[in-house]
Amino acid sequence: MNAIRKFMFYKQSDGKENRIYLSGELDLSAASSLANVLDSVVRKEEETLILDLKELKYIDSTGIGLIVSAIKVRAAMHASFQIDHIPAKVRRLFDITGVSSYLHNNGSLRENQRITERKEEII
C-alpha cells in the first residue's frame, strides 16, 4: 500500500514577523502552494521571515529551490530571514547542496554578498 504524500503549512503573523510552519513532504506537487504564500511575504522587508521545518519529513530539489529563492530575495534586501528546527535529514541536504553555508548554526541568514553574487554555488 502506498502512503499518500501530504504537505501542509500554516502562517502566523504578528506585524513583526511572518512565521511559516511546514509539515509533511515538500515536493514538486506541493511546491506551488508554498510558492504562493512565500510570494505574499518574502518582500515584506520590515518583518522577519521565519520558516519552521520541525515537522518537515521530506524535501526535494523543488522545495530547496523555493527556500534558495527566499534566501536570495531576503539577502538582496538585507532583510531578516531565519530557518528554525531543521530536521537532520533536511540539514544533510542543505549541507550537500551548499544551502547551509548561507545560514548561521541557528538558521539565521548570514550577511554575505556571495548569496546574490555567486548564485551558481547554491544547488
List the predicted regions and their residue ranges.
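STAS-like cytosolic regulatory interaction modules
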Residues: 1-57, 69-123
